[in-house]
Amino acid sequence: MVSKTDDIPASVPNCSPADFARDGETANSKGTTSKKEASCACGHGVETAVMNGDAGHDQAEEADSKQDGSGDADQAEDANEQEVIVIQDTGFTVKIQAPGTEPFDLQVSPQEMVQEIHQVLMDREDTCHRTCFSLQLDGNVLDNFAELKSIEGLQEGSLLKVVEEPYTVREARIHVRHIRDLLKSLDPSDAYNGVDCNSLSFLSVFSEGDLGDTGKRKKKGSELEQIDCTPPEHILPGSKERPLVPLQPQNKDWKPMQCLKVLTMSSWNPPPGNRKMHGDLMYLYIVTVEDRHVSITASTRGFYLNQSTTYNFSPKPANPSFLSHSLVELLSQISAAFKKNFTTLQKKRVQRHPFERIATPFQVYSWTAPQIDHAMDCVRAEDAYTSRLGYEEHIPGQTRDWNEELQTTRELSRKNLPERLLRERAIFKVHSDFAAAATRGAMAVIDGNVMAINPGEETRMQMFIWNNIFFSLGFDVRDHYRELGGDSAAHAAPTNDLNGVRAYSAVDVEGLYTLGTVVVDYRGYRVTAQSIIPGILEREQEQSVIYGSIDFGKTVVSHPKYLELLEKTSRPLKVQRHAVLNEKDSAVELCSSVECKGIIGNDGRHYILDLLRTFPPDLNFLPVEGEELTPESQKLGFPRQHRHRLACLRQELIEAFVEHRYLLFMKMAALQLMQQKANKDKTAALQDSNAAGAGSENKPLALESCDGTPDSPTSSESTLTPEDSEATTVSENSSAENQEAMTEVPVASINGTHEPLAAERQNGGCDGPLEGKEADENIPGLAQAKELAESLAAEDGSGIDPKSREVVLNACKAVGSISNTSFDIRFNPDIFSPGVRFPDDSNDDIKKQKQLLKDAAAFLVSCQIPSLVKDCLDHSSLPMDGATLTEALHQRGINVRYLGTVLEFMDNMPAKAQLEHIYRIGISELITRCAKHIFKTYLQGVDLSALSAAVSYFLNCLLSSFPDAVAHLPADELVSRKKSRKRRNRVPGGGDNTAWASLTPSELWKNITSEAHGYYNFSLQCESVDQAVEKYGLQKITLLREISIKTGIQILIKEYNFDSRHKPAFTEEDILNIFPVVKHVNPKASDAFHFFQSGQAKVQQGFLKEGCELINEALNLFNNVYGAMHVEICACLRLLARLNYIMGDHPEALSNQQKAVLMSERVLGIEHPNTIQEYMHLALYCFANGQLSTALKLLYRARYLMLVVCGEDHPEMALLDSNIGLVLHGVMEYDLSLRFLENALAINTKYHGPRSLKVALSHHLVARVYESKAEFRSALQHEKEGYTIYKNQVGEAHEKTKESSEYLKYLTQQAVALQRTMNEIYKNGSNASIMPLKFTAPSMASVLEQLNIINGIIFIPLSQKDLENLKAEVQRRQLMQDSGKIQEQQGSHLELDDKLPVDD
């Protein structure tokens, strides 16, 4: 199938705008000469030449079209109709014939490998017990690694035979392992223990099996009667109880079904020589449920009972002898219980949703777990002592050469879509395997199970190699980082380095290689795991480094090949090529920071490593003598001393800053052009002949002042014309009106609430007028400025008159561009690096660069922080816990070290009350991060045998109200007779191993407050956990969750009494495990992502069907690269479900959303804020499908999770409670419904202000329930409130106001009728003739309509004519945007809210 997508160039693998800039016309494969619009899916236009690398999201053109993601996809159809051939498998059916079963049909696709059919058969209920077989077509054995399309004679209807093959030792082991996996398939212990990429999911507990089976539901009437709607007490609004146990409800499927008591390797292994020659491979020892002990031989022909006992070796077959090719068949013969239970178990296994059992790409750990019985398990025991990672033993040569695998996958061809998919899939797979291996190795290193390569040195200086991975500890070895902050710098360097590796991998330049890098924090230590450059261990570092510096800049070397390769990355990464002086005082050219080292491996590849300074330094945290920061920074108390001197700006900040500068550049050029035009007109009027001369004499005023101070954009900003300077130096004080400009025409924006992809547009420029297109539109010359800048960049500029060139030159100087003819901002990462010296002739450049860095630091505090706070105020950013808050900071390029500054900023806001939820999450994040810093050093002094005692003691000091916590030193389990004087294992610095026990709660809290002050510059007003809870409104269970997730602690799931003053909350039995916290690179599926963005864009333009097709295509591509489980697939499924719902396909919406919930639980965690969102969406679709009780259960689950994660006081809780209240109203539980709706009303009033439309809607919902209860007075009171808000906010004529007014009339009539009836009763007593009052339960349709409204989905039937008008209007606007002619049009803009399914 050929799917036409108008905005994805087939030939651009990783659409880097820089490519467009270089290739000029060639990017436009249809050969159109118009260079204006070769837009790729990310919406970069060819203007990128004027812009700068990846910030190519041309803000000036797109600030306005934020709502349609990919710029003007519509006109692009004519401009360059790129056709993308998407591999669409036309699947076909084959017949499979397995021994002992009927032939069955299997749907396959030509792209699949034979191996994938093997996997399917090993998973099917009737063939799952076979592992050692081949597939044969007409007697020919098929090659496992062949693609089906390459097999001759294989077609629709072919018969494939499953033929049993003889076993080898390897095959026998695989068989036993597979049988064990089948026996354990419903057992959640692997998920609790965080092994084999298993993780938890509880959706099925609430949805009672699959949600698709609507057909089996009872009729509406009976459905209502059978619902038990009352939630548990702790879920009701106002409940202060936060139990922990319901976090993991017991799944009835998990009652263990025992098939065998013991399955283990026999101690008679391996077979002696004479038995090998009889075909014996290994011996198994088994105890059946009936308590029969048997010994089994695995031979080349299969499995049989032998006559051995525990003490007597007798390998002859037992009598009667059964030889079975499969262990399951043999066990079914000898144990009836096994046969019965195994069959039931497999039935249950296949009934589970596949997403509950597919492995996740990276391990997810659970911070709570129940007490599980530790069962005998031979495979687990064997795995613990061999390095089985993935499939080592299947690969020749045993251990994997990680470096070779990682680099070879990068070298795969990427010319067309199928090749790119193959390449990205390979890269992703190797990365997830490498991350798993590195994690396991890092734990082995810290647990003391790996021999060091320099065992003679003290522990903290040791380095390790295990499984072809190099491990080093995060300590300052050999005073390498002494000048940069010692151990603190050594701890920060690996994460900086990892960010550098991420950045270079994303740019993906051919011929430039980075190391596989994983950073693991485990038991208080930071371990860096890296793949090994071939040959590096044989040479001294001095000999191998041919680019960069090994001593922070004292000696520096360079290499032309490296300069050439790094030059390609410099544009997207905004790195300026620069010269530094070496020890001989001669200049050396670099295109990276000096620490970045280039090494050519023995494999001839060019590697770069030590990328810790890929991004420029953050001057707010780097005091430099004699340097003044900008006033914005100084006002907030910067620069501040930081623990180390490696504080860098984030890549997101650099991109936002450059984008911000680009807008500025465009405005300045436009203003100058206008002034020139005005001057020209004047002089033309005076005398035509001198026009040219006069024009050049009357150089515009603004320009002269710009010229005077080209170095400092901040100073030049103030010299622009007044209207413009207002627009550029806006910071905190930007008024709310400016923001209204942004909310123009969101046609059906269906990104749900937390669409990660939509969020990427948010880090646009500064707060205030810079955001909206309208601000630019006041400057009439903008379109000319854009054309001018483009034409300059496109040619050598010879055809352009000098005046225009001067305009661009001035604008370039003013914004700090490194080029004089085009906009190009880059940073020199070596500025302010101690020990780095620059040649004298670059002094001017250095001065400019210093200023640019100061401006970037000022931009962070004066623009990005206020814009984050503004987004929180208008609820476009809704963090719920520490992780989502950190993500919100990072999206805008704000490092977490600014957390104190952000909190301070909120504290001083007039609208502080409306930010209370964010402030509370921020404080809890600050406290738990400080506690984590302390915990790290605390754990380093703890012996392995005292670990659980130490961890529980620390948690008591942190969270328990028990005043005199006493540590239990682990003297209880064993006391050694002689004091062993062995060298203590792995305690850097040795010292007293019981020092940890002397910590007290008050001392810990003192340390936390001083850490908060020292690290975050924030003064915490509390001396104990109870004061913190009291003052900041925190919850202890939330603090426990945050600290456990951050440090990897796993605790027993039970109810903890934190507030008891008589006994501590935690005992050492409550600490079940410590897991590693792992950071790694996340390789991306670039093509799928482009499809996804184009789909979003289409949807937002109102083309739902086209959008839906693109997103389905994206889903296929995501699955192709990531496999079935990934966080991006989750976002894709959610959007698809929403589209299905809007387009009226409710069952399909339900099915996709169910997958999204399961995936979110498995990949992000069962109580991650995203999972809570997914539960809410699923409940809505369940309700629409008539599954009322399920909808309620899901909403109650979401509410419980949210209470644990952030408590009740959060704007999102209002939405949740409105949903619950509406569903309860629908099932006629009026009193319960009111509790939730009134709570929603209170929260909405607090966070949106009493006059907001959300509050008006809340009043209306409450009024409806009161009406159903016949309490008309209360109903009237609420509806009146709502009416007043509507009247004041949208005016009398608006539909909402009219509806409210009608409803008021109706309520008044009802109230009067009721009063009349009551009077009648009072007057005539019981024999009054009463007209029966009409009590109506709300119809399901009306409840659903309200549910849609509060969830941001509004359906309004449109006639064909309306649709055409709407389309015409959308196109007209786009045309106007292109030509830059939209004037301030706010008065006239379409009220689209009422025309289409809108989702806000």
Swiss-Prot record:
- Which residues belong to any copy of the Clu domain? 380-622
Q: Which UniProt keywords apply?
A: Cytoplasm, Repeat, TPR repeat
Q: Which Gene3D superfamilies match?
A: Hypothetical protein (hspc210), Tetratricopeptide repeat domain
Residue ranges under compositional bias (Basic and acidic residues)? 56-69, 1390-1400
Compartments in which it is found: Cytoplasm
- State the PROSITE patterns in the record: CLU
User: One short Pfam family name for this protein?
Assistant: CLU_N
Molecular function as annotated in GO = mRNA binding
Q: Which CDD domains match?
A: CLU-central (cd15466)
InterPro entries cross-referenced by the UniProt entry: CLU-central (IPR033646), CLU_dom (IPR025697), CLU_N (IPR028275), CLU_prot (IPR027523), GSKIP_dom_sf (IPR023231), TPR-like_helical_dom_sf (IPR011990)
Task: Give the start-end ranges of region Disordered.
Answer: 1-39, 56-78, 212-243, 684-741, 1377-1400
List the transmembrane segments: none
**Positions annotated as TPR repeat:** 1088-1121, 1130-1163, 1172-1205, 1214-1247
Q: What is its main location?
A: cytoplasm
Low complexity compositional bias, start-end: 707-722
Q: Which domain of life is it from?
A: Eukaryota
Q: Biased composition, Polar residues: where in the chain? A: 727-741, 1377-1388
Cellular component per GO, a single term: cytoplasm
PANTHER family in UniProt: CLUSTERED MITOCHONDRIA PROTEIN HOMOLOG, EUKARYOTIC TRANSLATION INITIATION FACTOR 3 SUBUNIT EIF-3
| Similarity comment: family membership | Belongs to the CLU family.
Function text: mRNA-binding protein involved in proper cytoplasmic distribution of mitochondria.
Protein's UniProt name: Clustered mitochondria protein homolog
